[in-house]
């Protein structure tokens, strides 16, 4: 897992574009971005997501290849990029808990 800038993320996206589209279209799909919360703490990152956004809004990447198939979404991983907010540990249906998404995380995800 390494910390990256938006400029690095943009380069990674450009470098992965052809491969991710080929993978998605092999299943008759368009490329998807899946936005998640990790159900972890603000500094807890997971390799299941291509991109993790910590509580400070810093961007962490688990791979150098955004077309790599990772286990972020059941039966929807091929041709998809998983983006997770490091947040929502112990969240409940009506309460996001002590680790609710921060304004900075939401801004960076947007």
Predicted regions and their residues:
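Active-site-adjacent loop/helix surface patches within enzyme catalytic domains
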Residues: 1-110
